[in-house]
Design a protein with these regions (language model features):
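N-lobe entry segment of adenylate-forming
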Residues: 1-86, 90-93, 97-100, 184-190, ...
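Conserved AMP-binding/adenylate-forming core of the ANL superfamily
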Residues: 55-56, 69, 73-128, 145-150, ...
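Conserved pre-ATP/AMP-binding loop-to-beta segment of ANL
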Residues: 69-71, 194-202, 206-239, 246, ...
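A short helix-loop-beta submotif of the ANL/AMP-binding
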Residues: 99, 112, 118-146, 156-161, ...
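Conserved AMP-binding loop of ANL adenylate-forming enzymes
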Residues: 115, 235, 256, 261, ...
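AMP-binding/adenylate-forming catalytic core of the ANL superfamily
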Residues: 140-166, 180, 324, 331, ...
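Conserved adenylate-forming
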Residues: 146, 150-209, 273, 308-438, ...
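AMP-binding/adenylate-forming catalytic domain of the ANL superfamily
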Residues: 192, 196, 533, 565-590, ...
Protein backbone atom coordinates (compact mmCIF):
# COMPACT_ATOMS: atom_id res chain seq x y z
CA UNK A 1 0.00 0.00 0.00
CA UNK A 2 1.28 3.43 -0.89
CA UNK A 3 2.77 2.99 -4.38
CA UNK A 4 0.09 5.00 -6.19
CA UNK A 5 0.08 7.73 -3.55
CA UNK A 6 3.89 7.94 -3.43
CA UNK A 7 4.18 8.14 -7.21
CA UNK A 8 1.42 10.77 -7.49
CA UNK A 9 2.87 12.86 -4.68
CA UNK A 10 6.36 12.71 -6.18
CA UNK A 11 5.08 13.73 -9.62
CA UNK A 12 3.23 16.72 -8.15
CA UNK A 13 6.45 18.03 -6.59
CA UNK A 14 8.88 17.19 -9.38
CA UNK A 15 6.74 18.59 -12.19
CA UNK A 16 3.91 20.65 -10.69
CA UNK A 17 3.02 22.35 -13.98
CA UNK A 18 2.39 19.08 -15.82
CA UNK A 19 0.57 17.59 -12.83
CA UNK A 20 -1.89 20.46 -12.39
CA UNK A 21 -2.35 21.00 -16.13
CA UNK A 22 -3.63 17.42 -16.30
CA UNK A 23 -5.92 18.01 -13.28
CA UNK A 24 -7.25 21.19 -14.91
CA UNK A 25 -8.76 19.15 -17.75
CA UNK A 26 -11.65 18.31 -15.38
CA UNK A 27 -12.65 22.00 -15.35
CA UNK A 28 -14.56 23.79 -18.13
CA UNK A 29 -12.51 26.57 -19.77
CA UNK A 30 -13.64 29.17 -22.30
CA UNK A 31 -9.97 29.63 -23.19
CA UNK A 32 -7.03 27.59 -21.93
CA UNK A 33 -4.10 29.17 -20.13
CA UNK A 34 -0.89 30.57 -21.59
CA UNK A 35 1.22 29.56 -18.60
CA UNK A 36 0.37 26.95 -15.99
CA UNK A 37 2.35 28.71 -13.24
CA UNK A 38 3.71 32.22 -12.80
CA UNK A 39 5.78 32.34 -9.62
CA UNK A 40 7.17 35.87 -9.91
CA UNK A 41 7.21 38.26 -6.95
CA UNK A 42 6.53 35.55 -4.35
CA UNK A 43 2.96 35.15 -5.64
CA UNK A 44 1.89 31.87 -7.19
CA UNK A 45 -0.59 32.42 -10.01
CA UNK A 46 -1.98 29.29 -11.61
CA UNK A 47 -3.34 28.94 -15.16
CA UNK A 48 -2.31 32.43 -16.24
CA UNK A 49 -4.32 33.65 -19.23
CA UNK A 50 -6.96 30.95 -18.77
CA UNK A 51 -10.59 32.06 -18.97
CA UNK A 52 -13.46 30.36 -17.11
CA UNK A 53 -16.35 30.92 -14.69
CA UNK A 54 -16.67 29.20 -11.32
CA UNK A 55 -20.48 29.42 -11.22
CA UNK A 56 -20.72 27.88 -14.70
CA UNK A 57 -18.62 24.94 -13.49
CA UNK A 58 -20.76 24.56 -10.36
CA UNK A 59 -24.22 24.77 -11.96
CA UNK A 60 -24.67 25.39 -15.72
CA UNK A 61 -22.25 22.66 -16.77
CA UNK A 62 -24.35 19.98 -15.04
CA UNK A 63 -27.57 21.33 -16.58
CA UNK A 64 -25.98 21.32 -20.05
CA UNK A 65 -24.75 17.76 -19.45
CA UNK A 66 -28.26 16.49 -18.70
CA UNK A 67 -28.13 16.50 -14.90
CA UNK A 68 -30.46 19.47 -14.40
CA UNK A 69 -33.11 17.42 -12.58
CA UNK A 70 -30.66 15.98 -10.05
CA UNK A 71 -30.83 17.39 -6.53
CA UNK A 72 -28.16 20.03 -6.01
CA UNK A 73 -29.08 21.34 -2.57
CA UNK A 74 -31.06 20.12 0.43
CA UNK A 75 -31.91 22.67 3.12
CA UNK A 76 -32.67 21.26 6.56
CA UNK A 77 -33.45 23.71 9.37
CA UNK A 78 -34.54 22.20 12.69
CA UNK A 79 -34.49 25.68 14.25
CA UNK A 80 -37.30 26.80 11.91
CA UNK A 81 -38.79 23.35 11.14
CA UNK A 82 -38.15 23.92 7.42
CA UNK A 83 -36.99 21.61 4.65
CA UNK A 84 -36.45 22.50 0.98
CA UNK A 85 -34.84 20.88 -2.05
CA UNK A 86 -33.40 22.41 -5.24
CA UNK A 87 -32.41 20.64 -8.44
CA UNK A 88 -29.40 21.88 -10.38
CA UNK A 89 -31.70 23.64 -12.86
CA UNK A 90 -33.76 25.28 -10.11
CA UNK A 91 -30.63 26.45 -8.31
CA UNK A 92 -29.06 27.69 -11.56
CA UNK A 93 -32.19 29.69 -12.39
CA UNK A 94 -32.35 31.36 -8.97
CA UNK A 95 -28.63 32.17 -9.03
CA UNK A 96 -28.95 33.65 -12.54
CA UNK A 97 -31.82 35.90 -11.38
CA UNK A 98 -29.95 37.10 -8.30
CA UNK A 99 -26.92 37.78 -10.49
CA UNK A 100 -29.33 39.84 -12.60
CA UNK A 101 -30.33 41.87 -9.53
CA UNK A 102 -26.68 42.57 -8.78
CA UNK A 103 -25.96 43.54 -12.38
CA UNK A 104 -28.98 45.87 -12.48
CA UNK A 105 -27.63 47.62 -9.38
CA UNK A 106 -24.28 48.25 -11.01
CA UNK A 107 -22.21 45.31 -9.72
CA UNK A 108 -19.57 44.35 -12.29
CA UNK A 109 -16.56 42.04 -12.50
CA UNK A 110 -14.02 42.89 -9.79
CA UNK A 111 -16.50 44.65 -7.50
CA UNK A 112 -16.66 43.38 -3.94
CA UNK A 113 -19.92 42.18 -2.36
CA UNK A 114 -20.10 41.50 1.38
CA UNK A 115 -22.46 38.65 2.32
CA UNK A 116 -23.77 38.55 5.91
CA UNK A 117 -26.14 35.60 6.05
CA UNK A 118 -27.34 32.69 8.20
CA UNK A 119 -27.19 29.08 6.99
CA UNK A 120 -30.00 29.25 4.45
CA UNK A 121 -29.99 28.47 0.70
CA UNK A 122 -29.88 32.18 -0.09
CA UNK A 123 -26.37 32.37 1.40
CA UNK A 124 -25.08 29.96 -1.25
CA UNK A 125 -27.18 31.61 -3.95
CA UNK A 126 -25.61 34.98 -3.11
CA UNK A 127 -22.09 33.53 -3.30
CA UNK A 128 -22.74 31.81 -6.62
CA UNK A 129 -24.44 34.92 -8.04
CA UNK A 130 -21.29 36.92 -7.32
CA UNK A 131 -19.14 34.24 -8.94
CA UNK A 132 -21.45 34.29 -11.98
CA UNK A 133 -20.69 37.98 -12.54
CA UNK A 134 -17.01 37.81 -11.63
CA UNK A 135 -17.71 39.92 -8.54
CA UNK A 136 -15.60 39.12 -5.48
CA UNK A 137 -17.67 37.93 -2.53
CA UNK A 138 -16.60 38.33 1.07
CA UNK A 139 -18.75 36.26 3.42
CA UNK A 140 -18.86 37.45 7.02
CA UNK A 141 -20.05 34.95 9.60
CA UNK A 142 -23.70 35.66 10.46
CA UNK A 143 -24.18 37.21 13.87
CA UNK A 144 -20.80 38.95 14.04
CA UNK A 145 -21.12 42.14 16.07
CA UNK A 146 -21.32 45.49 14.28
CA UNK A 147 -17.70 46.47 14.94
CA UNK A 148 -16.30 43.28 13.39
CA UNK A 149 -18.63 43.53 10.42
CA UNK A 150 -17.64 47.18 9.99
CA UNK A 151 -13.90 46.41 9.87
CA UNK A 152 -14.49 43.94 7.06
CA UNK A 153 -16.74 46.34 5.15
CA UNK A 154 -14.11 49.06 5.52
CA UNK A 155 -11.36 46.77 4.24
CA UNK A 156 -13.24 45.15 1.33
CA UNK A 157 -15.08 48.35 0.26
CA UNK A 158 -18.08 46.52 -1.24
CA UNK A 159 -20.41 48.06 -3.81
CA UNK A 160 -23.25 45.99 -2.33
CA UNK A 161 -24.03 44.10 0.87
CA UNK A 162 -26.32 41.07 0.87
CA UNK A 163 -27.93 40.11 4.17
CA UNK A 164 -30.96 38.51 5.79
CA UNK A 165 -33.27 40.08 8.31
CA UNK A 166 -32.19 37.62 11.00
CA UNK A 167 -30.47 34.42 12.01
CA UNK A 168 -32.03 31.73 14.21
CA UNK A 169 -30.22 30.18 17.14
CA UNK A 170 -31.44 27.29 19.32
CA UNK A 171 -33.41 29.53 21.67
CA UNK A 172 -33.15 33.03 20.21
CA UNK A 173 -33.41 35.21 17.11
CA UNK A 174 -30.40 37.34 16.15
CA UNK A 175 -31.57 40.44 14.31
CA UNK A 176 -29.00 40.88 11.54
CA UNK A 177 -30.39 44.03 9.93
CA UNK A 178 -29.90 46.33 12.96
CA UNK A 179 -26.34 44.98 13.28
CA UNK A 180 -25.77 45.72 9.59
CA UNK A 181 -27.20 49.24 9.89
CA UNK A 182 -24.96 49.98 12.88
CA UNK A 183 -21.90 48.56 11.08
CA UNK A 184 -22.48 50.77 8.02
CA UNK A 185 -22.82 53.83 10.27
CA UNK A 186 -19.34 53.09 11.64
CA UNK A 187 -17.80 52.93 8.15
CA UNK A 188 -16.38 55.72 6.04
CA UNK A 189 -17.05 53.46 3.02
CA UNK A 190 -20.78 53.21 2.27
CA UNK A 191 -22.25 50.53 -0.02
CA UNK A 192 -24.67 51.84 -2.63
CA UNK A 193 -27.18 49.01 -2.10
CA UNK A 194 -28.18 46.45 0.52
CA UNK A 195 -30.12 43.41 -0.72
CA UNK A 196 -32.16 41.98 2.17
CA UNK A 197 -33.78 38.54 2.44
CA UNK A 198 -36.76 38.99 4.77
CA UNK A 199 -37.38 36.00 7.03
CA UNK A 200 -40.81 35.47 8.64
CA UNK A 201 -39.31 35.20 12.13
CA UNK A 202 -38.27 38.87 12.01
CA UNK A 203 -39.17 41.50 9.41
CA UNK A 204 -36.48 44.15 9.14
CA UNK A 205 -37.08 47.86 8.72
CA UNK A 206 -35.91 48.93 5.26
CA UNK A 207 -34.21 52.17 4.28
CA UNK A 208 -35.86 53.14 0.96
CA UNK A 209 -32.81 54.97 -0.45
CA UNK A 210 -30.49 51.99 0.08
CA UNK A 211 -32.26 48.71 0.90
CA UNK A 212 -34.12 46.47 -1.53
CA UNK A 213 -36.28 43.43 -0.82
CA UNK A 214 -34.59 40.37 -2.31
CA UNK A 215 -37.74 38.29 -2.79
CA UNK A 216 -39.70 41.07 -4.52
CA UNK A 217 -36.74 41.99 -6.71
CA UNK A 218 -36.07 38.38 -7.72
CA UNK A 219 -39.66 37.93 -8.94
CA UNK A 220 -39.29 40.68 -11.55
CA UNK A 221 -35.67 40.12 -12.63
CA UNK A 222 -34.45 38.13 -15.62
CA UNK A 223 -31.49 35.81 -15.24
CA UNK A 224 -28.08 36.61 -16.70
CA UNK A 225 -25.40 34.39 -18.22
CA UNK A 226 -22.03 33.72 -16.57
CA UNK A 227 -19.32 36.32 -17.21
CA UNK A 228 -15.96 34.87 -18.34
CA UNK A 229 -13.17 35.76 -15.92
CA UNK A 230 -9.44 35.13 -15.85
CA UNK A 231 -8.26 32.15 -13.81
CA UNK A 232 -6.16 34.58 -11.77
CA UNK A 233 -9.07 36.92 -11.01
CA UNK A 234 -10.15 36.74 -7.35
CA UNK A 235 -13.19 34.59 -6.57
CA UNK A 236 -13.48 35.66 -2.95
CA UNK A 237 -11.92 37.34 0.06
CA UNK A 238 -12.29 35.50 3.37
CA UNK A 239 -11.24 37.16 6.60
CA UNK A 240 -9.61 34.81 9.04
CA UNK A 241 -11.68 34.07 12.14
CA UNK A 242 -10.68 35.67 15.42
CA UNK A 243 -9.01 38.61 13.72
CA UNK A 244 -8.14 41.49 16.04
CA UNK A 245 -7.20 44.95 14.86
CA UNK A 246 -7.21 45.29 11.09
CA UNK A 247 -8.76 42.23 9.41
CA UNK A 248 -6.69 39.84 7.29
CA UNK A 249 -8.46 39.05 4.04
CA UNK A 250 -7.26 35.88 2.31
CA UNK A 251 -7.63 36.15 -1.49
CA UNK A 252 -8.63 33.04 -3.47
CA UNK A 253 -8.42 32.88 -7.27
CA UNK A 254 -11.06 31.40 -9.59
CA UNK A 255 -9.06 28.95 -11.71
CA UNK A 256 -6.71 27.37 -9.19
CA UNK A 257 -9.54 27.04 -6.69
CA UNK A 258 -11.78 25.20 -9.16
CA UNK A 259 -9.02 22.77 -10.13
CA UNK A 260 -8.12 21.97 -6.51
CA UNK A 261 -11.77 21.55 -5.47
CA UNK A 262 -12.37 19.04 -8.26
CA UNK A 263 -9.13 17.19 -7.53
CA UNK A 264 -9.89 16.92 -3.81
CA UNK A 265 -13.39 15.52 -4.35
CA UNK A 266 -12.14 12.97 -6.87
CA UNK A 267 -9.06 11.87 -4.93
CA UNK A 268 -9.48 12.64 -1.21
CA UNK A 269 -13.18 12.53 -0.37
CA UNK A 270 -14.14 9.81 -2.86
CA UNK A 271 -17.28 11.76 -3.79
CA UNK A 272 -18.84 11.20 -7.19
CA UNK A 273 -21.62 12.96 -9.09
CA UNK A 274 -24.94 12.09 -7.46
CA UNK A 275 -23.43 11.47 -4.02
CA UNK A 276 -24.90 13.29 -1.02
CA UNK A 277 -22.27 15.38 0.77
CA UNK A 278 -23.03 16.74 4.26
CA UNK A 279 -20.59 19.29 5.61
CA UNK A 280 -21.78 20.40 9.05
CA UNK A 281 -20.14 23.80 9.09
CA UNK A 282 -21.05 27.37 8.13
CA UNK A 283 -20.47 29.28 4.90
CA UNK A 284 -18.77 31.95 7.02
CA UNK A 285 -15.76 29.66 7.43
CA UNK A 286 -13.39 28.21 4.84
CA UNK A 287 -14.74 24.66 5.27
CA UNK A 288 -18.15 25.98 4.30
CA UNK A 289 -16.80 27.84 1.26
CA UNK A 290 -14.93 24.80 0.00
CA UNK A 291 -17.12 21.85 1.01
CA UNK A 292 -20.65 23.16 1.45
CA UNK A 293 -20.64 25.34 -1.65
CA UNK A 294 -18.01 24.95 -4.32
CA UNK A 295 -16.47 21.46 -4.28
CA UNK A 296 -19.71 19.43 -3.95
CA UNK A 297 -21.50 21.44 -6.65
CA UNK A 298 -18.53 21.40 -9.02
CA UNK A 299 -18.48 17.63 -8.69
CA UNK A 300 -22.21 17.18 -9.30
CA UNK A 301 -22.99 16.13 -5.73
CA UNK A 302 -26.00 17.00 -3.59
CA UNK A 303 -24.89 19.36 -0.82
CA UNK A 304 -26.74 19.76 2.48
CA UNK A 305 -27.27 23.17 4.08
CA UNK A 306 -27.96 22.53 7.75
CA UNK A 307 -29.28 25.33 9.96
CA UNK A 308 -28.86 23.71 13.36
CA UNK A 309 -26.41 22.32 15.90
CA UNK A 310 -24.92 18.87 16.49
CA UNK A 311 -26.81 18.82 19.82
CA UNK A 312 -29.92 20.58 21.17
CA UNK A 313 -31.66 20.70 17.78
CA UNK A 314 -33.35 18.83 19.30
CA UNK A 315 -30.86 16.26 20.69
CA UNK A 316 -27.54 14.50 19.91
CA UNK A 317 -29.17 12.57 17.05
CA UNK A 318 -29.19 15.51 14.60
CA UNK A 319 -26.35 14.28 12.36
CA UNK A 320 -27.55 10.67 12.39
CA UNK A 321 -31.12 11.70 11.51
CA UNK A 322 -29.88 13.68 8.50
CA UNK A 323 -27.67 10.80 7.33
CA UNK A 324 -30.62 8.38 7.38
CA UNK A 325 -33.20 10.79 5.94
CA UNK A 326 -31.14 11.97 2.97
CA UNK A 327 -28.94 8.89 2.50
CA UNK A 328 -25.74 10.85 3.09
CA UNK A 329 -22.58 9.29 1.62
CA UNK A 330 -19.91 11.57 3.13
CA UNK A 331 -20.02 13.49 6.43
CA UNK A 332 -17.57 16.32 7.14
CA UNK A 333 -17.45 18.23 10.43
CA UNK A 334 -15.16 19.63 13.11
CA UNK A 335 -13.94 17.42 15.98
CA UNK A 336 -15.63 19.78 18.43
CA UNK A 337 -19.05 18.78 17.03
CA UNK A 338 -18.36 15.13 17.77
CA UNK A 339 -17.03 15.98 21.22
CA UNK A 340 -20.31 17.77 21.92
CA UNK A 341 -22.24 14.68 20.79
CA UNK A 342 -19.96 12.40 22.83
CA UNK A 343 -20.45 14.54 25.93
CA UNK A 344 -24.25 14.21 25.74
CA UNK A 345 -24.37 10.65 24.41
CA UNK A 346 -21.15 8.93 25.55
CA UNK A 347 -22.49 5.42 24.89
CA UNK A 348 -23.87 6.28 21.47
CA UNK A 349 -27.44 5.31 22.28
CA UNK A 350 -28.84 7.83 19.77
CA UNK A 351 -26.62 6.50 16.98
CA UNK A 352 -28.19 3.05 17.31
CA UNK A 353 -31.63 4.43 16.42
CA UNK A 354 -30.66 5.35 12.86
CA UNK A 355 -29.65 3.53 9.69
CA UNK A 356 -26.22 4.74 8.58
CA UNK A 357 -25.76 2.22 5.74
CA UNK A 358 -25.46 4.93 3.08
CA UNK A 359 -22.54 6.59 4.89
CA UNK A 360 -19.14 5.60 3.51
CA UNK A 361 -16.80 7.86 5.47
CA UNK A 362 -16.52 10.65 8.03
CA UNK A 363 -14.00 13.48 7.69
CA UNK A 364 -12.93 15.83 10.47
CA UNK A 365 -11.02 19.11 10.19
CA UNK A 366 -10.82 22.60 11.66
CA UNK A 367 -8.73 21.69 14.70
CA UNK A 368 -6.63 18.77 15.90
CA UNK A 369 -8.72 15.64 16.47
CA UNK A 370 -7.64 13.74 19.57
CA UNK A 371 -7.29 9.97 19.23
CA UNK A 372 -10.00 9.23 21.80
CA UNK A 373 -12.67 11.17 19.89
CA UNK A 374 -11.62 9.63 16.58
CA UNK A 375 -11.80 6.11 18.01
CA UNK A 376 -15.15 6.85 19.67
CA UNK A 377 -16.74 7.94 16.38
CA UNK A 378 -15.24 4.98 14.54
CA UNK A 379 -16.34 2.43 17.12
CA UNK A 380 -19.96 3.59 17.29
CA UNK A 381 -20.57 4.40 13.61
CA UNK A 382 -18.43 1.56 12.26
CA UNK A 383 -17.26 3.95 9.53
CA UNK A 384 -13.72 5.11 8.69
CA UNK A 385 -12.97 8.46 10.33
CA UNK A 386 -10.46 10.53 8.39
CA UNK A 387 -8.70 13.48 9.99
CA UNK A 388 -7.39 16.16 7.65
CA UNK A 389 -5.34 19.28 8.33
CA UNK A 390 -5.61 22.57 6.51
CA UNK A 391 -6.09 26.30 6.95
CA UNK A 392 -8.17 29.22 5.74
CA UNK A 393 -5.09 30.22 3.76
CA UNK A 394 -4.73 26.92 1.88
CA UNK A 395 -8.42 26.37 1.07
CA UNK A 396 -8.08 22.57 1.08
CA UNK A 397 -6.24 19.78 2.86
CA UNK A 398 -2.48 20.04 3.37
CA UNK A 399 -2.53 16.53 4.85
CA UNK A 400 -5.26 13.93 4.47
CA UNK A 401 -5.99 10.32 3.59
CA UNK A 402 -6.70 10.20 -0.17
CA UNK A 403 -9.46 7.59 -0.08
CA UNK A 404 -10.06 7.32 -3.82
CA UNK A 405 -6.49 7.91 -4.98
CA UNK A 406 -5.17 5.23 -2.62
CA UNK A 407 -6.44 4.81 0.93
CA UNK A 408 -3.70 4.73 3.55
CA UNK A 409 -3.65 2.91 6.88
CA UNK A 410 -5.10 5.24 9.52
CA UNK A 411 -2.85 6.20 12.42
CA UNK A 412 -4.79 7.74 15.29
CA UNK A 413 -3.65 11.29 15.97
CA UNK A 414 -2.34 11.85 12.44
CA UNK A 415 -4.15 13.50 9.50
CA UNK A 416 -2.15 10.97 7.45
CA UNK A 417 0.15 12.24 4.68
CA UNK A 418 0.81 15.45 2.71
CA UNK A 419 -1.43 15.86 -0.32
CA UNK A 420 -0.03 16.34 -3.82
CA UNK A 421 1.35 19.84 -4.31
CA UNK A 422 2.06 20.39 -0.62
CA UNK A 423 5.81 19.95 -0.12
CA UNK A 424 5.64 19.74 3.67
CA UNK A 425 8.83 20.09 5.70
CA UNK A 426 9.66 20.30 9.41
CA UNK A 427 12.12 23.11 10.20
CA UNK A 428 13.98 24.15 13.31
CA UNK A 429 14.09 27.77 14.43
CA UNK A 430 17.07 28.44 12.14
CA UNK A 431 15.22 27.14 9.08
CA UNK A 432 17.09 23.83 8.85
CA UNK A 433 15.10 20.77 7.79
CA UNK A 434 14.64 18.16 10.53
CA UNK A 435 14.58 14.40 10.14
CA UNK A 436 11.83 11.86 10.78
CA UNK A 437 10.28 12.06 14.24
CA UNK A 438 11.90 15.40 15.09
CA UNK A 439 9.46 18.05 16.32
CA UNK A 440 9.63 21.49 14.75
CA UNK A 441 7.80 24.11 12.72
CA UNK A 442 5.62 22.84 9.87
CA UNK A 443 6.36 24.73 6.65
CA UNK A 444 5.51 24.31 2.97
CA UNK A 445 8.29 24.53 0.43
CA UNK A 446 7.27 26.89 -2.35
CA UNK A 447 5.48 26.97 -4.75
CA UNK A 448 2.12 26.46 -3.10
CA UNK A 449 -0.38 24.36 -5.09
CA UNK A 450 -3.57 25.72 -6.71
CA UNK A 451 -6.28 27.23 -4.45
CA UNK A 452 -3.84 28.49 -1.84
CA UNK A 453 -4.00 32.19 -1.01
CA UNK A 454 -2.90 34.65 -3.67
CA UNK A 455 -2.13 37.16 -0.94
CA UNK A 456 -3.82 39.36 1.65
CA UNK A 457 -6.33 41.86 0.32
CA UNK A 458 -4.77 45.30 -0.10
CA UNK A 459 -1.83 44.35 2.15
CA UNK A 460 1.00 42.58 0.35
CA UNK A 461 3.47 43.54 3.08
CA UNK A 462 1.38 41.70 5.67
CA UNK A 463 1.27 38.64 3.42
CA UNK A 464 5.04 38.54 3.06
CA UNK A 465 5.73 39.32 6.70
CA UNK A 466 3.23 36.79 8.04
CA UNK A 467 3.93 33.84 5.75
CA UNK A 468 7.09 34.15 3.65
CA UNK A 469 9.79 36.22 5.37
CA UNK A 470 10.65 34.04 8.38
CA UNK A 471 11.95 31.15 6.26
CA UNK A 472 12.78 32.31 2.70
CA UNK A 473 11.58 29.76 0.15
CA UNK A 474 8.93 28.40 2.52
CA UNK A 475 5.38 29.22 3.55
CA UNK A 476 5.00 29.36 7.35
CA UNK A 477 1.91 27.42 8.49
CA UNK A 478 2.26 28.61 12.08
CA UNK A 479 1.76 25.04 13.32
CA UNK A 480 4.23 22.73 15.02
CA UNK A 481 4.55 19.00 14.59
CA UNK A 482 6.61 16.23 13.05
CA UNK A 483 6.61 13.65 10.26
CA UNK A 484 7.27 10.05 11.27
CA UNK A 485 9.45 7.51 9.44
CA UNK A 486 6.44 6.36 7.38
CA UNK A 487 5.66 9.89 6.18
CA UNK A 488 2.68 10.45 8.48
CA UNK A 489 2.11 14.01 9.65
CA UNK A 490 1.44 14.87 13.30
CA UNK A 491 0.21 18.38 14.08
CA UNK A 492 0.85 19.30 17.70
CA UNK A 493 -0.69 22.77 17.69
CA UNK A 494 0.07 26.38 16.94
CA UNK A 495 3.59 27.67 17.44
CA UNK A 496 2.39 29.42 20.59
CA UNK A 497 1.23 25.99 21.85
CA UNK A 498 4.83 25.10 22.68
CA UNK A 499 5.72 25.90 26.29
CA UNK A 500 9.14 26.08 27.88
CA UNK A 501 9.19 24.23 31.20
CA UNK A 502 12.55 24.68 32.90
CA UNK A 503 14.31 24.71 29.53
CA UNK A 504 12.30 21.78 28.13
CA UNK A 505 10.15 22.58 25.07
CA UNK A 506 6.88 20.70 25.49
CA UNK A 507 3.69 20.54 23.43
CA UNK A 508 0.41 21.37 25.12
CA UNK A 509 -1.30 19.53 22.25
CA UNK A 510 0.51 16.34 23.20
CA UNK A 511 -0.70 16.73 26.78
CA UNK A 512 -4.27 17.23 25.57
CA UNK A 513 -4.00 14.04 23.55
CA UNK A 514 -3.04 12.13 26.71
CA UNK A 515 -5.73 13.69 28.91
CA UNK A 516 -8.41 12.88 26.32
CA UNK A 517 -7.68 9.17 26.87
CA UNK A 518 -9.09 9.36 30.43
CA UNK A 519 -12.45 7.52 30.44
CA UNK A 520 -14.30 10.37 32.20
CA UNK A 521 -13.03 13.19 29.95
CA UNK A 522 -15.19 14.54 27.09
CA UNK A 523 -12.73 17.24 26.01
CA UNK A 524 -9.88 19.26 27.40
CA UNK A 525 -7.46 22.13 26.89
CA UNK A 526 -3.94 22.73 28.19
CA UNK A 527 -2.23 26.12 28.33
CA UNK A 528 1.12 27.37 29.58
CA UNK A 529 1.12 29.81 32.51
CA UNK A 530 3.98 31.90 33.86
CA UNK A 531 5.95 30.40 36.73
CA UNK A 532 8.73 32.12 38.70
CA UNK A 533 10.75 28.94 39.11
CA UNK A 534 10.33 27.10 35.80
CA UNK A 535 9.42 29.92 33.42
CA UNK A 536 6.22 28.19 32.37
CA UNK A 537 4.14 25.29 33.63
CA UNK A 538 1.06 23.63 32.10
CA UNK A 539 -2.49 24.16 33.36
CA UNK A 540 -5.32 21.83 32.32
CA UNK A 541 -9.05 22.39 31.81
CA UNK A 542 -11.25 19.30 31.77
CA UNK A 543 -14.87 18.84 30.62
CA UNK A 544 -16.47 15.62 31.83
CA UNK A 545 -18.79 13.31 29.94
CA UNK A 546 -22.48 13.48 30.78
CA UNK A 547 -23.48 11.46 33.83
CA UNK A 548 -20.04 11.43 35.48
CA UNK A 549 -20.60 12.10 39.19
CA UNK A 550 -17.24 11.04 40.60
CA UNK A 551 -15.33 13.38 42.88
CA UNK A 552 -13.55 15.97 40.73
CA UNK A 553 -10.41 15.79 42.82
CA UNK A 554 -10.01 12.10 42.02
CA UNK A 555 -10.48 12.72 38.31
CA UNK A 556 -7.88 15.51 38.32
CA UNK A 557 -5.44 13.26 40.16
CA UNK A 558 -6.00 10.56 37.56
CA UNK A 559 -5.38 12.98 34.71
CA UNK A 560 -2.19 14.30 36.34
CA UNK A 561 -0.98 10.72 36.76
CA UNK A 562 -1.69 9.95 33.09
CA UNK A 563 0.42 12.87 31.86
CA UNK A 564 3.23 11.97 34.24
CA UNK A 565 3.10 8.37 33.04
CA UNK A 566 3.19 9.30 29.32
CA UNK A 567 5.57 12.30 29.33
CA UNK A 568 7.25 12.09 32.70
CA UNK A 569 7.88 14.42 35.61
CA UNK A 570 9.57 16.83 33.18
CA UNK A 571 6.09 17.98 32.10
CA UNK A 572 5.45 19.46 35.57
CA UNK A 573 1.75 18.90 34.95
CA UNK A 574 0.17 19.31 38.38
CA UNK A 575 -2.53 21.97 37.98
CA UNK A 576 -5.90 21.13 36.45
CA UNK A 577 -9.55 21.94 37.01
CA UNK A 578 -12.91 20.59 35.93
CA UNK A 579 -15.12 23.08 34.04
CA UNK A 580 -18.59 22.70 32.54
CA UNK A 581 -17.47 23.84 29.08
CA UNK A 582 -14.48 25.26 27.19
CA UNK A 583 -14.62 28.73 25.64
CA UNK A 584 -14.77 28.46 21.86
CA UNK A 585 -15.27 30.43 18.70
CA UNK A 586 -18.41 29.76 16.71
CA UNK A 587 -16.34 27.60 14.37
CA UNK A 588 -15.35 25.37 17.30
CA UNK A 589 -11.79 26.51 17.98
CA UNK A 590 -10.88 26.52 21.68
CA UNK A 591 -9.86 29.96 22.95
CA UNK A 592 -6.65 28.84 24.65
CA UNK A 593 -5.14 32.31 24.30
CA UNK A 594 -7.95 33.80 26.40
CA UNK A 595 -7.50 31.11 29.06
CA UNK A 596 -3.83 31.99 29.27
CA UNK A 597 -4.57 35.72 29.46
CA UNK A 598 -6.85 35.12 32.43
CA UNK A 599 -4.37 32.81 34.15
CA UNK A 600 -1.52 35.29 33.72
CA UNK A 601 -3.59 38.35 34.60
CA UNK A 602 -2.85 40.04 31.28
CA UNK A 603 -5.27 42.08 29.18
CA UNK A 604 -8.14 39.93 27.95
CA UNK A 605 -8.73 40.23 24.19
CA UNK A 606 -11.96 38.35 23.56
CA UNK A 607 -12.58 37.77 19.83
CA UNK A 608 -15.89 38.65 18.22
CA UNK A 609 -16.14 35.02 17.15
CA UNK A 610 -16.71 33.78 20.73
CA UNK A 611 -19.70 31.46 21.00
CA UNK A 612 -20.65 32.11 24.66
CA UNK A 613 -18.88 34.69 26.82
CA UNK A 614 -20.47 33.18 29.96
CA UNK A 615 -18.26 30.11 29.51
CA UNK A 616 -15.20 32.36 29.67
CA UNK A 617 -16.46 33.91 32.92
CA UNK A 618 -17.00 30.46 34.45
CA UNK A 619 -13.45 29.46 33.47
CA UNK A 620 -12.12 32.64 35.06
CA UNK A 621 -13.72 31.62 38.37
CA UNK A 622 -12.12 28.18 38.07
CA UNK A 623 -8.73 29.79 37.38
CA UNK A 624 -9.14 32.06 40.41
CA UNK A 625 -9.96 29.01 42.56
CA UNK A 626 -6.58 27.55 41.53
CA UNK A 627 -4.89 30.68 42.88
CA UNK A 628 -4.32 32.41 39.54
CA UNK A 629 -3.35 34.92 38.37
CA UNK A 630 -0.43 35.01 40.80
CA UNK A 631 -0.05 38.77 40.43
CA UNK A 632 -3.72 39.47 41.14
CA UNK A 633 -3.05 41.02 44.53
CA UNK A 634 -0.40 43.33 43.10
CA UNK A 635 -2.74 45.05 40.67
Amino acid sequence: MGIVYEQTYRESLQNPEAFWAEAAKKVHWYNEWDRVLDDSDGHYRWFVGGCMNTCYNALDLHVHNGRGDQLALIYDSPVTDTKKKYTYKQLRDRVAKVAGILANKGVVKGDRVVIYMPMIPEALIAMLACARLGAIHSVVFGGFVAHELATRIEDAKPRMIISASCGIEVSSIIEYKPILDEAIKKCTHKPTTCLIWQRPQYRANMLPWRDIDWELEEEKTRGVDPVPVLATDPLYILYTSGTTGSPKGVIRSNGGHSVAMKWSMDNIYNAKAGDVFFTASDVGWVVGHSYIVYAPLMNGCTTIVYEGKPVRTPNPSAFWRIIEEYKVNVLFSAPTAFRAIKKEDPKGEWIKKFNLDSLRSIFVAGERCDSDTLKWIEKLTKKPVIDNWWQTETGWAIAANPLSLEAQVVKAGSPTKPMPGFNLKVLDEKGQELGAGKKGILCLKLPLPPACLMGIWENDERYRRGYLDQFPGYYLTGDTGYIDKDGYVYVLGRMDGIINVAGHRLSTGEMEEIIAKHPDVAECAVIGVNDELKGEIPMGFIVLKEGIERDHRGIVEGVVALVRQEIGAVASFKIATVVSALPKTRSGKILRKNLREMADGSTLNVPATIEDSNVLKACEKAINALGYPKNKGEK
